[in-house]
Amino acid sequence: MGISKKSLISVTLVLFLIVSIGFLYVFNPIQTKPKRVGVLFYQSNPTTLRFLAGLKTGLAKQGYYQGENLDLVVENFQNSTPKVTMATLRKIAQKRVKVLITTGKDLTITTAHTFRDKPIIYTLVSRPITKETIQTIIDEKNITGVSYFTPYDRTLELAQRIIPHFKRLTLILPPHSAWTDYKRLSEAAQKTGIQLNQIATPLPDLERTILNLKGKTDAIFLPYDIQLIFRAGLLKAALIKASLPAISNNLEYQSGCVLTYYAEPETIGEIAGQMAVKIFHGAKVKYLPIELSSYYKLTINKALLEKLNFSIHEDVLSYANEVIR
C-alpha cells in the first residue's frame, strides 16, 4: 500500500518543524527566562555609570538585553549604614540573582558573606586581584573579577609635558587612608626624576594645606580615596586658589585636574559582561581567570591649564582622548 503524495508532504513538514525546533533549542543559548544579575555599587559616580553602560554593551554583544532576556538589579550603597546594607542585600537575595557584580572591597566582602553560594565578579580594582586581595572573603572559589594596573609611569611622563619645570609632586591623603599604592607611585616618580612627598591632612584642613603648598611643590597628586572623592569640588576650588595643578588616575577628579589618565570603565564593564555570560552557560567561577584590562584614556583639561596660565603643547593634546575646553 503506497503513501500518498499529500501524506508524504505532511510528514516532511512535520519532520522539518521538529528539526528546526531542535536546532533552535541546541544552538540558541538564550533562554526565555530572563537571567537576573545583581550589580552592586559602593557609590554612584561617573566611573560606575560608565561601567554600567559598558556592562550592558558587553551583555548585548552576547545576545542579552535588559527588559527582554536580562534583568539587571542595580543597587547603589553610597552612604548606606551597615544595617541598611544588610537589609538591601537580603532583598537582592530574595530576587534569586544568577550572578553578582560588585565594586569596592568592603562591599564585596559583605556580599560574599551574604551570598555564600553565588558567583561574584569583583570589578574596578586598581591592581590585579590576588588571593591576598580577597583573603578575608569566606569562599574565594566563588569570586573572580576584572582589574587594571594604574599606569603611574605614563601619567607622570605625560604630566611632565604640560606642567612647567615639574620636579616636585605632593601626594595628599587623609589620616588612616586605605590607599595602598604609595610604593608604586614612588617608584614611578623615581623613574621619571620627580621628588615625591606625602602629606596626611585632616579633612577640615584640606584647603589650608593646599594653600600652604604654593611654592613648595609643582603639582598635587589626587589618589583614589573615598573621603577625598566626596570633596572633589572643594579640592578643585582650593587648587585654583593656590594656582597649583593636580593630576590623577581617577575620573572623579577630572574637572579639577589638568591631566587625568584612567582605566576606561566601559571596557571593564564589557569584560565583566562577557564573564557573566560564561557563568550563564555553566562556567565555574573557580576556573575563570581574573581578567586584566589594559585600555586607558587620557583627558587634558585645557580650560584649567589656561586658567593657571600654563602654555599648552599641541603635541600632548593630540594624544588626548578628551580635551576639556
Which role fits each region the language model picked out?
Residues G2-R325:
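Short hydrophobic alpha-helices and adjacent helix-cap/hinge residues
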